[in-house]
């Protein structure tokens, strides 16, 4: 008699109690990595015994972000897909074969029960390596699905998306998995602490400005050019200009502080300190702003295939945000449109409710439950 039988467990019970092994593939950019890590955290909350392994490349941000969150990182060769026909296309089959082989070795070594892909350079080899051997779950964060996820969706057990119009057939819309510090954020309760943390006026209307991890020149120019008018109107600003940029702002005597910083480590406090946010509309940013119910002015990145404008559309349509094209974001636009908005408390309150109505605070838990279900654990 086996120990399982002696203890009253059947074979199925023993399998169900084995620690699940989840492999997440979402390296390259923060937009791919952060949802993967949010899922990893949610899986651990549901199954503390779970083993979560992240796939990445040697040059991606995951080399810093994944170890910092306490998860093992396995490096595989990236498979960048050229947007246009180039000589690099001739090398693609060899690169794909090498990366798939290395990825399969990782999946075997960790005993993967499920592979969860979020798009990006490491997702394609992960999907191909797992195909027919390890169940696949695909999550698409952008309003327009990328090539890797289009491929993975063809043989995935489950396909999830942030928005209904991702282009992936049969996808279930659940939003984007976010950090618990964002999904549980109570802006009103943290407001005083957040204002003190950043040295902001405790009561003045405050605008949060940021352009992603590297900042945005358009936003930097527009707001630094309007700093004097903002200060004289009694509006404070918390502005993350990017670590590679500098921002010279003359403080208006007696006015609320214009706090220009290279980078924001505590986005939860930044959101809590603000009454209005002006930012790009990457998928993660839109998801976070929606989850915390912060009125927004989105300035989509003017490059790519227009996905940033599409990401923002659900919030704009609901009345929780405005959309300003990059080329139209000027100091004059800030003074004539954004300044009056920052001073209109009633309008901001209405926008906050509308923004919150589009958010998905439970996406991390929902995705974690789906992943564990597919893994059979």
UniProtKB/Swiss-Prot annotation:
Cell wall formation. Catalyzes the transfer of a GlcNAc subunit on undecaprenyl-pyrophosphoryl-MurNAc-pentapeptide (lipid intermediate I) to form undecaprenyl-pyrophosphoryl-MurNAc-(pentapeptide)GlcNAc (lipid intermediate II). Disulfide bonds: none annotated. Pathway: Cell wall biogenesis; peptidoglycan biosynthesis. Belongs to the glycosyltransferase 28 family. MurG subfamily. It is an enzyme of class 2 (transferase). One of its GO terms (biological process) is regulation of cell shape. Gene3D superfamilies: Glycogen Phosphorylase B. InterPro entries: GlcNAc_MurG (IPR006009), Glyco_trans_28_C (IPR007235), GlycoTrans_28_N (IPR004276). This is UDP-N-acetylglucosamine--N-acetylmuramyl-(pentapeptide) pyrophosphoryl-undecaprenol N-acetylglucosamine transferase. It is found in: Cell membrane. Its EC number is 2.4.1.227. It comes from the Bacteria. UDP-N-acetyl-alpha-D-glucosamine binds at residues 29-31, 142, 179, 213, 308. PANTHER family: GLYCOSYLTRANSFERASE (PTHR21015:SF22), UDP-N-ACETYLGLUCOSAMINE--N-ACETYLMURAMYL-(PENTAPEPTIDE) PYROPHOSPHORYL-UNDECAPRENOL N-ACETYLGLUCOSAMINE TRANSFERASE 1 (PTHR21015). Keywords: Cell cycle, Cell division, Cell membrane, Cell shape, Cell wall biogenesis/degradation, Glycosyltransferase, Membrane, Peptidoglycan synthesis, Transferase. CDD domains: GT28_MurG. It is a peripheral membrane protein. GO terms for cellular component: plasma membrane. It catalyses: di-trans,octa-cis-undecaprenyl diphospho-N-acetyl-alpha-D-muramoyl-L-alanyl-D-glutamyl-meso-2,6-diaminopimeloyl-D-alanyl-D-alanine + UDP-N-acetyl-alpha-D-glucosamine = di-trans,octa-cis-undecaprenyl diphospho-[N-acetyl-alpha-D-glucosaminyl-(1->4)]-N-acetyl-alpha-D-muramoyl-L-alanyl-D-glutamyl-meso-2,6-diaminopimeloyl-D-alanyl-D-alanine + UDP + H(+). GO terms for molecular function: UDP-N-acetyl-D-glucosamine:N-acetylmuramoyl-L-alanyl-D-glutamyl-meso-2,6-diaminopimelyl-D-alanyl-D-alanine-diphosphoundecaprenol 4-beta-N-acetylglucosaminlytransferase activity; undecaprenyldiphospho-muramoylpentapeptide beta-N-acetylglucosaminyltransferase activity.
């Amino acid at each position: 008699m086996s120990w399982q039988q002696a203890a009253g467990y059947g074979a199925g019970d023993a399998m169900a109690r084995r620690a699940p092994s989840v492999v997440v593939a979402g390296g390259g950019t923060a937009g791919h990595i952060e949802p993967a890590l949010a899922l990893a955290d949610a899986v651990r909350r549901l199954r503390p015994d779970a083993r979560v392994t992240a796939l990445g490349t040697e040059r991606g941000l995951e080399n810093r972000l994944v170890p910092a969150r306490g998860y093992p990182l396995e490096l595989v060769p990236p498979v960048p897909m050229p947007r246009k026909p180039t000589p690099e296309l001739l090398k693609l089959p060899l690169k794909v074969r090498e990366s798939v082989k290395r990825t399969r070795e990782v999946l075997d070594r960790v005993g993967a029960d499920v592979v969860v892909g979020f798009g990006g350079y490491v997702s394609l080899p992960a999907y191909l390596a797992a195909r027919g051997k390890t169940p696949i779950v695909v999550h698409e964060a952008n309003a327009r699905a990328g090539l890797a996820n289009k491929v993975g969706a063809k043989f995935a057990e489950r396909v999830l998306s942030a928005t209904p119009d991702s282009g992936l057939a049969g996808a279930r819309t659940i939003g984007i998995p976010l950090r618990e510090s964002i999904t549980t954020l109570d802006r009103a309760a943290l407001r005083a602490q957040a204002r003190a943390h950043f040295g902001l006026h405790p009561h003045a209307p405050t605008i949060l400005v940021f352009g992603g991890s590297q900042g945005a020149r358009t936003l930097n120019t527009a707001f630094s050019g309007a700093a004097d008018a903002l200060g004289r109107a009694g509006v404070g600003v918390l502005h993350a200009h990017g670590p590679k940029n500098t921002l010279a702002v003359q403080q208006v005597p007696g006015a609320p502080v214009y706090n220009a910083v290279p980078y924001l480590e505590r986005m939860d406090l930044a959101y809590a300190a603000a009454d209005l946010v002006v930012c790009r509309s990457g998928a993660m940013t839109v998801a976070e702003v929606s989850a915390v119910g912060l009125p927004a002015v989105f300035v989509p990145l003017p490059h790519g295939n227009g996905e940033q404008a599409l990401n923002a559309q659900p919030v704009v349509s609901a009345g929780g945000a405005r959309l300003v094209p990059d080329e139209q974001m000027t100091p004059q636009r800030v003074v004539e449109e954004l300044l009056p908005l920052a001073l209109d408390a009633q309008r901001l309150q209405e926008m906050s409710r509308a923004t919150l109505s589009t958010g998905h605070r439970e996406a991390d838990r929902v995705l974690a439950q789906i992943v564990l279900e597919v893994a059979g654990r």
